[in-house]
Amino acid sequence: MTPVEFLASNPLAFVLCALVLGLLVGSFLNVVIHRLPIMMQRDWQSQAREFLELPAEPAGAAFNLFLPHSRCPHCDHQIRAWENIPLISWLALRGKCSACKASISKRYPLVELACGLLSGYVAWHFGFSWQAGAMLLLTWGLLAMSMIDVDHQLLPDSLVLPLLWLGLIINSFGLFASLEDALWGAVVGYLALWSVYWLFKLVTGKEGMGYGDFKLLAMLGAWGGWQVLPLTILLSSVVGAVLGTVMLRMQKAESGTPIPFGPYLAIAGWVALLWGDQITASYLQFARL
């Protein structure tokens, strides 16, 4: 029996493998979340210097998603392999650097745990299938985008656009929606928030959201078809309004403070892709339509 046949015939083993893989990917996503915005800023600065015809900055050491090796931000201690095992290392080190004993942010293990649990659930929901593999990629991308948006109010094109094209490609095989529905989903998803953006700007003179949000909703439409868009917009708006109000009441945000909308879109789109039909059917039954 090949490993593929074993996983296909043992759902629990597939779920456990997906969970472990998710933990490992979550560790890498922590690197992406931290380094990708820095890489983008350096690229923008380089382009600005070139546009202004300024001398290029001297080339420094390589800085990308793989180099240099991760180090403690407090003492510059290079993280060893055994200190980089998802969850286990953080627990073994009791959340502190092995060299200087400075605290390690709890967000690192939480991202790893979230990625692992979400990956395990996707494997359980879809079973051993192409849908599960595709949904894992989308889940990891949405998690990275959401955290970057929380930190920087930025949704990188380098993450959003490849996933948009991937959604169209996989739906050319009808994995989640027909190609026609996926194309309309991408177009309508972009135009829906673009229209809201300009209407809000005309009325208030302010920008209510960023262009990255348009692209993110277009990407979700490319994955689930235009049918997932109404539920995605509704859920993200409700959750965003509720959490925004809670944050204002708790004085964690001031009135007028920009609140990233990307995480709400990501969560709502993920929910709509997994349970959209069930949620819609339950609502129609409740409303007796």
Swiss-Prot record:
Plays an essential role in type IV pili and type II pseudopili formation by proteolytically removing the leader sequence from substrate proteins and subsequently monomethylating the alpha-amino group of the newly exposed N-terminal phenylalanine. Keywords: Cell inner membrane, Cell membrane, Hydrolase, Membrane, Metal-binding, Methyltransferase, Multifunctional enzyme, Protease, S-adenosyl-L-methionine, Transferase, Transmembrane, Transmembrane helix, Zinc. It comes from Stutzerimonas stutzeri. Its main location: membrane. GO terms for biological process: methylation; signal peptide processing. It is found in: Cell inner membrane. The chain crosses the membrane at residues 13-33, 128-148, 159-179, 183-203, 228-248, 256-276. One of its GO terms (molecular function) is methyltransferase activity. It comes from the Bacteria. It is a multi-pass membrane protein. GO terms for cellular component: plasma membrane. This is Prepilin leader peptidase/N-methyltransferase. It holds the Pfam family Peptidase_A24. Zinc is required for the N-terminal methylation of the mature pilin, but not for signal peptide cleavage.
